[in-house]
Structures are given as structure tokens and as C-alpha cells.
């Protein structure tokens, strides 16, 4: 018995509709203990999921015991489980960010992107590929399938000084799924799931994906000079 609180983004990636690119939905289920069920840490979520309306209609779901992937099968008339998602690889050679916002980012974010784009000749000593679909659910599906990291940092523009994505119904459910798949999700420094949104539409910076790379980004944001390959005491490291 009892009731649950449902937080949902019914149409993620709506700017992709005109171009027939992937869009989707994001949802989160929370307990209703207390007077403000939507103002509790994301770690209290009971379940979270995304649905991608793409070449396949795919649902990714977690109940807090790993991550499941389902595909809508017309002949069956419903969703059929594909498999439990394999753990997200700790390291990656792919990153997703909207590079058109480069001039608005903090210097530390620019430094991370510059180091990746410098490839084998740069301080990372290896090649990276940059991705961007303008669809959070599609980015999540890609990262679950083959690893990678997603960044949507805060920037200097007034509407986005606290980030752009909504914590309650975008960042929290995606972070829950990612952590259940062995990845990491932060606001750049702090774990998203350890913080509670004060309002329904509170924005947050968001970084998620391969745990090793998410941790590296946190070091760029806090003390980039301490990163091994930028220290004169060390050679290149990936």
C-alpha cells in the first residue's frame, strides 16, 4: 500500500523532433514520507527510468538493484527485456558536450575539453571523439552501451549560472541509473544523488558516465595543476 511521488520529464530532447532525431522521456519514483517529497536527496529514489523513442523504442530501468534494458516489441505488444546492462567501462575515449557554449564556460571546463581535443599530441596522450545529440536519454543509452562521459556545465550566461538541466526530473533519475550501472554522476564535484533540490525546477550542472573520467573532471574543476600529466614530475598519462 501507500503512495508514491512521480517526477517526470515527458519529452526530453524536444528540439530534435523537427530533424527526426532521438527524443525520450525520463521518470523518477520517490517515497512520499514528509511534507515535501520532491525536496529529498536523489539517493532516496525507489526507481528511475528513461525511454528513447528512436530507431528502437528502448526503456532503461533501475529499481536500485542494477540496471535493466527493455525494447518495445510490436509482435509481443509490450517491452521485452534485453539484458542486464554490463558495467559502464571505467575509462573512455568519448566525451559529449555542446562545444558551441565554449566561450561561456569556466576556464577549468575549457582546459578539460582542450586536453581531450589535443588527442595523442596533447597531455592525455591518446585520441578522443566528441559526441553531442542534444538528447539526454540518447546520451545515456550510448554511454551505457559503450562507455563515455557527458558534461553539461554551468556557464557565464545568467539563466545557466547554476547549470541548465533540472535536478529533480532529469539529473536525479539519470544519475540513479548511471550509478546502478557502475558509473558516476556529479554536479562536476559533488555526487548528484547526495544533494536535494530546493525547488521543483532547480537547475544543476551535470557530469555522468565512466567513473574514472568523472573523477578526472572533478580534479580539473578543483585543482587542474595536480593532475599527473600536467605536473612536471610526471610524463603523459591517459
Regions found by a protein language model. Name each.
Residues 1-238:
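IMPase-like, lithium-sensitive Mg2+-dependent phosphomonoesterase catalytic core
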Amino acid at each position: 500500500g501507500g503512495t508514491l511521488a512521480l517526477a517526470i520529464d515527458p519529452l526530453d530532447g524536444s528540439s530534435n523532433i523537427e530533424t527526426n532525431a532521438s527524443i525520450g522521456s525520463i521518470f523518477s519514483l520517490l517515497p512520499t514520507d514528509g511534507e515535501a517529497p520532491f525536496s529529498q536527496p536523489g539517493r532516496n529514489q525507489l526507481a528511475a527510468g528513461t525511454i528513447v523513442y528512436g530507431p528502437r523504442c528502448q526503456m532503461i530501468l533501475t529499481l536500485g538493484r542494477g540496471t535493466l534494458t527493455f525494447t518495445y516489441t510490436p509482435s509481443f505488444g509490450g517491452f521485452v527485456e534485453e539484458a542486464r546492462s554490463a558495467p559502464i567501462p571505467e575509462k573512455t575515449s568519448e566525451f559529449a558536450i555542446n562545444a558551441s557554449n565554449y566561450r561561456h564556460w569556466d576556464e577549468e571546463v575549457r582546459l578539460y575539453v582542450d586536453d581531450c581535443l589535443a588527442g595523442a599530441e596533447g597531455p592525455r596522450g591518446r585520441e578522443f571523439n566528441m559526441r553531442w545529440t542534444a538528447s539526454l536519454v540518447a546520451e545515456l543509452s550510448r554511454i551505457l552501451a559503450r562507455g563515455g562521459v557527458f558534461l553539461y556545465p554551468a556557464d557565464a550566461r545568467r539563466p545557466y549560472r547554476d547549470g541548465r538541466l533540472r535536478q529533480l526530473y532529469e539529473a536525479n533519475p539519470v544519475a540513479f541509473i548511471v550509478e546502478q550501472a557502475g558509473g558516476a554522476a556529479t554536479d562536476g564535484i559533488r555526487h548528484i544523488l547526495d544533494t536535494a533540490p530546493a525547488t521543483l525546477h532547480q537547475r544543476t550542472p551535470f557530469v555522468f558516465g565512466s567513473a574514472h573520467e568523472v573523477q578526472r573532471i572533478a580534479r580539473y574543476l578543483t585543482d587542474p595543476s595536480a593532475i599527473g600529466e600536467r605536473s612536471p614530475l610526471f610524463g603523459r598519462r591517459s
